[in-house]
């Protein structure tokens, strides 16, 4: 009798386990995420073009990306397969005067080291992640390069500002924005360094290549060049790696490759709107995350479109809170590029504190001054001890930063005054 009860119990457990497995599998069916009509209307990767995404309204383009992402995550039918050839990846070494030295990924280390003074100060390496044909991308990269040229030419700018102020003292000119900029440059810190643009985005000539990019292997390829740089005398402590969109994850993989082979970490990796990874290998973790460098920060500008809502760094900034796109972005590509525009603005001398932010879980909490912790500044001059999620408000047009101080929460504000 006892053995019969045991058999019945075992049978019930097996049935329950099987039912639970069926229920779990049922939850993973695409029809549980999308309607049958929506599934039928999910376009293939070959049907999506960059031009189409730029011409579609932001919300419409975001829905297309979301559908592809969810179906791919459930069906696991998108396996990364595209790794650009190093000889096909353009690289530009930007001199302090703005002049570009063009080379390729397979020879940029030697070309860079041949430049006078290269690697004596900070080295900033930017991995693009959007097609170079995009007007939004062209403008974003132009602004970023201009900002770094200004930063590395600050001593000359300060000299020019002093001369300009001397001329204005003997005139009746009104105080204008150019004079205000001159005052900002006077108080900014002088710095020098080198800027390298690895134009990975130029190899993403169509959306399918973008979706099928092998982040891990491409990152390992980039990481090897960073190892070559340090082997030629460039300390990892002065390297700042910046990844845009999908290339934010490439930057993370590059950092992992560097650490695995050298036992050291890069000083900093910044993700400019880290993307949703549309294709990945099952059971393999990937993507930008804490630990890929000594310090990892990310700016999210299209969390519900091409960007990911997942925390990627030691500190993550969400301008205007997690959203499809930040104010002023009209399509999904422009929404991604805005993170680059924001970062560029923070690089420009005198604008380092244009983006005050506070720790908060939502824009509503931020506006109600119900956040927690102290104010911080998004962008280049970030404090490396920051941790958590930060919210801030931005303008729809340039200048994007709202220079007025971010909200101080009641608790922190009171504690601050009590200490002073």
Swiss-Prot record:
Residue numbers bearing the Phosphoserine modification: 177-178
Keyword terms: Phosphoprotein, Secreted, Signal, Sulfation
UniProt function note: Vitellogenin is the major yolk protein of eggs where it is used as a food source during embryogenesis. Vitellogenins and their receptor yl/yolkless are required for maintenance of microtubule plus-end orientation towards the posterior pole of oocytes. Involved in polarized localization of germ plasm components, such as osk mRNA and vas protein, to the oocyte posterior cortex. Receptor-mediated endocytosis by yl/yolkless is crucial for actin reorganization, mediated by osk isoform A/Long, required to anchor germ plasm components to the oocyte cortex.
Name of the featured protein: Vitellogenin-3
Post-translational modification: Tyrosine sulfation occurs in the female only and plays an essential functional role.
Disulfide bonds: none
Induction text: By beta-ecdysone; in males.
Disrupted-gene phenotype: Viable, even in combination with null mutations in Yp1 and Yp2.
Tissue note: Synthesized in the fat body and ovarian follicle cells and accumulate in the oocyte.
Region annotation Disordered: where it falls in the sequence: 401-420
Major subcellular site: secreted
Molecular function GO terms recorded: serine hydrolase activity
One cellular component (GO) term of this entry: extracellular region
Nucleotide-binding found in the keyword field: no
Protein localization: Secreted
Sulfotyrosine found at: 384, 390
Annotated signal sequence range: 1-19
Family under the similarity heading: Belongs to the AB hydrolase superfamily. Lipase family.
Outcome reported for the amino acid change (mutating residue 10 to D): In YP3s1; synthesized in the fat body, but not secreted, probably due to the amino acid mutation in the signal peptide
Native source organism of the sequence: Drosophila melanogaster (Fruit fly)
Gene that encodes it: Yp3
Keyword Kinase annotated: no
Residues found modified as Phosphothreonine: 37
GO annotation terms (biological process): embryo development ending in birth or egg hatching; lipid catabolic process; regulation of embryonic development; response to bacterium; sex differentiation
């Amino acid at each position: 009798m006892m053995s019969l009860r045991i058999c019945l119990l075992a049978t019930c457990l097996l049935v329950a386990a099987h039912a639970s497995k069926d229920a779990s599998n049922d939850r993973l069916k695409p029809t549980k995420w999308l309607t049958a009509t929506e599934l039928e209307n999910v376009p293939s990767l070959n049907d999506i073009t960059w031009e189409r995404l730029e011409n579609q309204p932001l919300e419409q383009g975001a829905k297309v990306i979301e559908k592809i992402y969810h179906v791919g995550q459930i069906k696991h039918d998108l396996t990364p397969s595209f790794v650009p050839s190093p000889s096909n990846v353009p690289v530009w070494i930007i001199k302090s005067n703005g002049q570009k030295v063009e080379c390729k990924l397979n020879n940029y280390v030697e070309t860079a080291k041949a430049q006078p003074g290269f690697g004596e100060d900070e080295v900033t390496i930017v991995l693009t992640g959007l097609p170079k044909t995009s007007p939004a991308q062209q403008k974003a990269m132009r602004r970023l390069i201009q900002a770094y040229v200004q930063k590395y030419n600050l001593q000359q700018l300060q000299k020019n500002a002093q001369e300009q102020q001397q001329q204005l003292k003997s005139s009746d000119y009104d105080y204008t924005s150019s004079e205000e900029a001159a005052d900002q440059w006077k108080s900014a810190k002088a710095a020098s360094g080198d800027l390298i643009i690895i134009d990975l985005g130029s190899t993403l000539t169509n959306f399918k290549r973008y979706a099928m990019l092998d982040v891990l292997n491409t990152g390992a390829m980039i990481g090897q060049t960073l190892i070559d740089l340090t082997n030629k005398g460039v300390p990892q402590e002065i390297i700042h790696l910046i990844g845009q969109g999908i290339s934010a994850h490439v930057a993370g993989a590059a950092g992992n490759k560097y650490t695995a082979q050298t036992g050291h970490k890069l000083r900093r990796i910044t993700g400019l709107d880290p993307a949703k990874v549309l294709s990945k290998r099952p059971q393999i973790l990937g993507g930008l995350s804490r630990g890929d460098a000594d310090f990892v920060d990310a700016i999210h500008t299209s969390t519900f479109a091409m960007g990911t809502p997942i925390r990627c760094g030691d500190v993550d900034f969400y301008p205007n809170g997690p959203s499809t796109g930040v104010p002023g972005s009209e399509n999904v590509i422009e929404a991604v590029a805005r993170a680059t525009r924001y970062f560029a603005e923070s690089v420009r001398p005198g604008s380092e504190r244009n983006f005050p932010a506070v720790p908060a879980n939502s824009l509503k909490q931020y506006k109600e001054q119900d956040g927690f912790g102290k104010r911080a500044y998004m962008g280049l001059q970030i404090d490396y001890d920051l941790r958590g999620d930060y919210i801030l408000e931005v303008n729809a047009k340039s200048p994007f930063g709202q220079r007025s101080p971010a909200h101080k929460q009641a608790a922190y504000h009171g504690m601050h005054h009590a200490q002073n």
